[in-house]
Regions:
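Class I SAM-dependent methyltransferase SAM/SAH-binding core
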Residues: 54, 58-105
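Short catalytic micro-motifs in class I SAM-dependent methyltransferases
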Residues: 120-121
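Conserved class I S-adenosyl-L-methionine
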Residues: 146-173
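Short alpha-helix
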Residues: 170-187
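Class I SAM-dependent methyltransferase Rossmann-like catalytic core
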Residues: 1-45
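A short glycine-rich, Lys/Arg-flanked "PGG" loop and its adjoining helix->strand segment in the class I
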Residues: 129-144
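A conserved beta-strand element that flanks and buttresses the S-adenosyl-L-methionine
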Residues: 117
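Short conserved loop adjoining the S-adenosyl-L-methionine
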Residues: 106-111
Length: 210
């Protein structure tokens, strides 16, 4: 799995460089902020102004962009590769955010957070169970986890993708029940499961847990 994870990380960084090539950065960031506002509205999650937030597997333009009044910790192993692509990492515009360049498995939270986001990231990691343990440790009692992931629709294709890396960016190929059971095993209670998008192979799900 470690080799597969390293390959996935390489192609993740490559994908972002290719995706952003020729795109006006201000327009992209404006679109991304609106995407996150719409996402929060769809899942009916309100964020109090001073609530502490962890954005685990934040990527270069994660949900950390839309919380200027909150203390935020944003963690990702590829931040060094994202910095040359995005000015907000170096221009001082995100002073409320502490960026941590680290795999989620190695991140030991310095505090517990009111709200933990792990969006489009959990199926990118090397050690799924260790990452879920880290998320559990980072979520304060009474706090919430918001986890989004592409989950397989069909058992047959799930097995095919597990054996043959047809989805190179995502080392983990699981279905919704698999993710729910893993969360339960790590002490989370899943409050809601919302499907935001349905395609042939995958459904895009948001799991809200505490």
């Amino acid at each position: 799995m470690k080799l597969r994870w390293k390959i996935a990380q390489f192609f993740e960084a490559w994908w972002w460089r290719r995706y952003l090539k020729g795109k006006p950065l201000p327009e992209y960031l404006a679109w991304k902020r609106q995407y996150w506002f719409d996402f929060l509205k769809k899942i009916d999650v309100a964020v109090p102004p001073k609530a502490s937030i962890l954005d685990a597997g934040c990527g270069p333009a994660g949900i950390f962009l839309v919380f200027p009044e909150n203390p935020v910790t944003a963690v990702d192993p590829l931040l060094a590769q994202y910095r040359p692509l995005f000015t907000h990492f170096t221009d001082g515009s995100l002073r409320n955010i502490r960026f941590v360049e680290q795999p989620m498995e190695q991140f030991v939270a310095p505090q517990q957070y009111d709200l933990v986001f792990c969006l489009n990231a959990i199926n990118h990691v090397a050690d799924l169970d260790l990452c879920l343990q880290r998320l559990r440790e980072a979520t304060r009692p009474g706090g919430s986890l918001v986890l989004s992931v592409d989950a397989h629709n069909h058992p047959f294709f799930k097995r095919v993708f597990q054996w043959v890396p047809g989805d190179i960016l995502h080392p983990h190929q699981l279905d919704l029940s698999d993710y729910q059971q893993r969360l339960l095993a790590h002490g989370f209670e899943v409050k809601r499961a919302l499907m935001l998008k349905q395609e042939f192979f995958f459904g895009y799900w948001v799991l809200l847990a505490s």
